[in-house]
Amino acid sequence: MADVKKVVLAYSGGLDTSVILKWLQDTYDCEVVTFTADLGQGEEVEPARAKAQAMGVKEIYIDDLREEFVRDFVFPMFRANTVYEGEYLLGTSIARPLIAKRLIEIANETGADAISHGATGKGNDQVRFELGAYALKPGVKVIAPWREWDLLSREKLMDYAEKHGIPIERHGKKKSPYSMDANLLHISYEGGVLEDTWTEHEEDMWRWSVSPENAPDQATYIELTYRNGDIVAIDGVEKSPATVLADLNRIGGANGIGRLDIVENRYVGMKSRGCYETPGGTIMLRAHRAIESITLDREVAHLKDELMPKYASLIYTGYWWSPERLMLQQMIDASQVNVNGVVRLKLYKGNVTVVGRKSDDSLFDANIATFEEDGGAYNQADAAGFIKLNALRMRIAANKGRALL
């Protein structure tokens, strides 16, 4: 791709992407536009501007995407009760399509003919970024330095940075032994001692939550208000999507909620161990299932449950911008029209317990479900014919001598 003139780089300001910035300038002799996304990762993003300016970058984008991230990506995903492989709440996966979208938007605004990212050739993120980019701008060029260069260790990156005058920190505060990724939905930890699947993670690894053992001895109760499948208020106070998630992270983390240690199957074929903190997302998943339990028709709920693993897989593997994900999203969103009401939760030492749910759109009828006298609301004698009709095929098979035992 020697003909690249201008490239938009997804830039964090850290060692890897700072080396990539200089490497792009030298290898491709091109202009580099930097893009730094604030997704609620809790780190200062402004230092990225100063570092990019020091490296001669003229066009610098630093975007606060927190509200868009939760409103247009996290909330739609949680309407489906999305979980990958039974446990993972897709905190990293769901952030990538938004970053890809902004990379392409900035490329269009600046006239760039290429984009670049710092994802390695071993992981899922390279796939997620690039599938999104090609879906939104089919002719875009993609530069993935980790698949091209020979700087395959941290020491080599440090040496390159020193040689080319890139500001780095060799000393100072202790660097975490883990590879971490954070946004408003979660923080993830990989590498280090976690590469041994038998070794327990260290307690001081966790950053967002207390251990369940050290959580308060007094339970915390909260009420979440839903409108069309999304949380709009906490304890009766209306909040923006990003504020909802930030507040639930704080409340959940204080009660030891949302820790996870799993081995997942990456799209590229390998298994990978990761630890995740997703306190707000853990609360949201439990609460959303609870409000759906009284507002969704049975067959709609069961169909959603059947389709959810496919929907989760599409997000995990980078197909957010695919026609099949968009089709599923329309179905999921249509199911949420009546998902309105309030869920009351008890948070205690790592546990999220639903203790109440109510809705003007509830399909729960106490007059029918009661164990007491129902006043004729339900005729129990009707069940006999229902059972016989549903047993018909099995009775026919038995009469034909089909062995079941």
Swiss-Prot record:
It comes from the Bacteria. GO terms for cellular component: cytoplasm. Its EC number is 6.3.4.5. It catalyses: L-citrulline + L-aspartate + ATP = 2-(N(omega)-L-arginino)succinate + AMP + diphosphate + H(+). Pfam families: Arginosuc_syn_C, Arginosuc_synth. One of its GO terms (biological process) is argininosuccinate metabolic process. NCBIfam families: argG, PRK00509.1. This is Argininosuccinate synthase. Belongs to the argininosuccinate synthase family. Type 1 subfamily. Gene3D superfamilies: Argininosuccinate synthetase, chain A, domain 2, HUPs, Single helix bin. ATP binds at residues 10-18, 37, 118. The gene is argG. Homotetramer. It comes from Pseudomonas putida (strain W619). Keywords: Amino-acid biosynthesis, Arginine biosynthesis, ATP-binding, Cytoplasm, Ligase, Nucleotide-binding. It is found in: Cytoplasm. The keyword Amino-acid biosynthesis applies.
